[in-house]
Amino acid sequence: MLDLYPVHNFTVEQLEYEKNTRVLQPVWDWIKNGNEHILSSPLFPPFYALSIDYTWVAVFTFIDLFLYDVPFFKNAKIQKDRVVTWDLMKKSLKLQGWNQLLWIYPMALVQLIWVPDTELPILAPTVFEMVSQLAIFFLAFDFTYFWFHYFNHKIKWLYRWCHSVHHMYSSPFAASAQHLHPFELFFVATFITTVPWIFPTHCLTYWLWFFVAQSVSYEVHIGYDFPFALHRIFWFYSGAPAHDMHHLRPLTCFQPWFNYLDRLMGYHITYEDLKKMTEAKFKKFGLYSVEDEKGLIKIN
C-alpha cells in the first residue's frame, strides 16, 4: 500500500505540526506502535476480515440459541414464527468452512507469497480523507452490488446456478450472511477488497472499510429489528427489515444497504405494505413461481 505521506516531503517541523494537528494521530500511533510486524504482514487483512466474520457469527449465534426468549430479543425478532436452531446453523457454517478452505485461505497464502509487506505511514489520515473515502466506497459497493444482485434474480439460470444458494434461507440469521455460492463469495470479496484501489487509501481507512462493509452485511442478516437500528433514523437505509423481506419475498428489496434504487424501481416494500394487499396479490407478490424454484433446496 502506498505511503501517502512520505517523510521526505516534510521538514521536521512540518511533520511534527501534522502529527499534532491530525485528530486521528493518537489513535493511529496507539494501533501501530509495537504492532508493526503484525499490521504490515500480507496475512493481516484476510485474517482481520475473518475475525470480523467470526465475531458477528459468535455473538448472534449465542443470542439466537440462548437468549431468544429474553423479551428484548423476542420483541425485536422480525419473523417471530421462525426459530433459529443449531441444525440450521450447522448447514450454513459447513458451507462457509468449505468456502474458506477453497478460496479464503488459498488467497491468503498467495498474498503471503506475492504481496510485499505494507508500509505503515507515520501520519494518520485526516478525518475528511477517511470519511469521504469511506462514503465513496460505501456508495460504490451498494450501487454495484444492487445490479449484480438484481441480475442474479432476473436471469433465471444465473439464479438457479448461483444466488439460489443464499436463498436456501427465507428467514435469515447472522450465520447465514456468508451462506454463498463460491462465485458470489468471490465477487463480493474481490469488490470489497479492491474498491479502495479507486485512489490511494491509508491503511487505517482500508481496515475500517473492511469493518464497516462486513458489519453492515451481517447487520442486515441478523433477523432482528432493534429500536436503535439505523433504518429508524435514516429513511434511505434499508437495514435488517428490508433484507429480511428480500429473503421472504426474493423479488423485492434488492439493494443491500440503501434503498433509493429499490424505491425508484418499485421494489421497496415493507411488512406493513404486505398486510394491506388483497389475498390474491399477497399470495404471489415478490415470489418466484413454483416452476422457477422447482428442484431448488430450501432449508427454512
From Swiss-Prot:
Disulfide bonds: none
Motif (Histidine box-1): 148-152
Naturally occurring in which organism (per UniProt): Caenorhabditis briggsae
Matches recorded under PANTHER family: STEROL DESATURASE
GO cellular component: endoplasmic reticulum membrane
Domain called Fatty acid hydroxylase: residue spans: 135-266
Annotated localization: Membrane
Name of the protein this chain belongs to: Cholesterol 25-hydroxylase-like protein
Family to which the UniProt record says this protein belongs: Belongs to the sterol desaturase family.
EC number: 1.14.99.-
Membrane topology label: Multi-pass membrane protein
Motif Histidine box-2 boundaries: 163-167
Biological function: Probable sterol desaturase.
Recorded GO MF terms: C-4 methylsterol oxidase activity; iron ion binding
Cofactor: Fe cation
Lipid metabolism is among the record's keywords: yes
Keywords, alphabetical: Glycoprotein, Iron, Lipid biosynthesis, Lipid metabolism, Membrane, Metal-binding, Oxidoreductase, Steroid biosynthesis, Steroid metabolism, Sterol biosynthesis, Sterol metabolism, Transmembrane, Transmembrane helix
Motif (Histidine box-3): 242-248
Main location: membrane
Enzyme class: oxidoreductase
GO biological process, one term: sterol biosynthetic process
InterPro entries for this protein: Fatty_acid_hydroxylase, Sterol_Desaturase_Related
Transmembrane segments annotated in the record for this chain: 43-63, 95-115, 130-152, 180-200
Glycosylated residues, chain numbering: N9
